[in-house]
Amino acid sequence: MIFQRTVQKMVKATGVGLHSGNKVTLSIMPAPVNTGIVLVRTDMNPAVAIPAKAEQVRETTMCTALVNDEGIRISTIEHLFAALAGLGIDNAVIEVDAPEIPIMDGSASPFVFLLQSAGIKEQAAPKKYLKIKRPVRVEDGDKWAELKPFKGFRVNFKIDFAHPEIARSQQHVVMDFSTSAFVKDISRARTFGFMRDIEYLRANNLALGGSMENAVVLDEYRVLNPDGLRYEDEFVKHKILDAFGDLYVAGHAILGEFTAYKTGHALNNQLVRALLAQQDAWELVSFEKEADVPVSFTVPGGAVYA
């Protein structure tokens, strides 16, 4: 049996909110089987829990935000969720003392480190995968995203930026997902932004925590970060990282091929909602044997069985 996973123990980190610029403390804690991922605002009295479900994503401008019926939000969840998806964590309670997840270094890598530091515990219940049975597609102008049947989880992603630095880089990546491929090739890709946009955002009290410490910053011609890029194709890889996080609000690891052109948070969420609304397009499956699983979430050394 392939089992569900949670973290072995609580782990804590402090960072800065991308938009507020304020200090944020994040705690990741174990959760029972079939809990899913639940986020909790501990700065509210009483604390407010918001389950990570596609229908709770009600804000997709500049980030992905979960918002409950009372309008209480937790923003910038996508990099943390990419790490949860990449390591195959099914169940966790995540507490945060602010309206946004800390931006850390602008990638998923610090969250991968946190989860690995907490340890990964296998639980006594079968892991469920969301298997795509037929194609589902959403479009917005020339942008589009699609999920279709595939034995593992493949990502086929293309961006199209006219900026000379991005245009010079590879803007099309096809990869077959595994935890090791995610950690090595995707997790360190940072969010990127243009100096002209950052100036506008700050004038509107946004991106107050943004800096070259947590983003790739470009002017009209080049990357301004003194250390340059982490990957030659960091731009498209960060868009893939965002998509991993955005798709994980489906509630399960996906078995299928995700193909996208110029998509962002809004279209990614539309795709998940469209998929879940068409119940003949997917099914939940479990696996008895490791050899039968078409996606590898390699269990790190030291994982224990509950």
Curated annotation (Swiss-Prot):
GO terms for cellular component: membrane. The gene is lpxC. The keyword Zinc applies. Keywords: Hydrolase, Lipid A biosynthesis, Lipid biosynthesis, Lipid metabolism, Metal-binding, Zinc. Zn(2+) binds at H79, H238, D242. Catalyzes the hydrolysis of UDP-3-O-myristoyl-N-acetylglucosamine to form UDP-3-O-myristoylglucosamine and acetate, the committed step in lipid A biosynthesis. It comes from Shewanella sp. (strain ANA-3). This is UDP-3-O-acyl-N-acetylglucosamine deacetylase. Its cofactor is Zn(2+). It is an enzyme of class 3 (hydrolase). Its EC number is 3.5.1.108. PANTHER family: UDP-3-O-ACYL-N-ACETYLGLUCOSAMINE DEACETYLASE 1, MITOCHONDRIAL-RELATED. One of its GO terms (molecular function) is UDP-3-O-acyl-N-acetylglucosamine deacetylase activity. GO terms for biological process: lipid A biosynthetic process. It catalyses: a UDP-3-O-[(3R)-3-hydroxyacyl]-N-acetyl-alpha-D-glucosamine + H2O = a UDP-3-O-[(3R)-3-hydroxyacyl]-alpha-D-glucosamine + acetate. HAMAP family: LpxC.
